[in-house]
Amino acid sequence: GVTVEVPSVKYRIDCLRNLPASIRFLSCEPLVEDLGELDLTNIDWVIVGGEHAINARPMKEEWVLSIKEQAEKQGALFFFKQWGSIGRDGVYRSVERNGSELQRKTYKAMPAVNRHTLFG
């Protein structure tokens, strides 16, 4: 997998796509900017989460929804990890209190993993 938290590192997706791997995934965490359009061809799984730190930057709900919609349209599984230290309402609180619901639902899709996937 590769981390893609800002648009300037989207080139990492192409690098990942060209590597031999059983499961290819993006970790969009901490998501600190709108990533815009994503080419998720041959990407199996997309994980999204907010930043958790004292000086955390907020993550906007529309950024998360855009990634979710693109993943669904392109056949990648979507996993929303958590809002981070700043909730969707802009309030700073613990990661646990901000939770992991997106539009009142949880998204915890994961690819199937078996011994063959892990060890070939």
Task: Walk through the language-model features, giving the residues of each.
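Core AdoMet radical
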Residues: 1-34, 43-59
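Auxiliary Fe-S-binding modules of radical SAM enzymes
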Residues: 32, 37-120
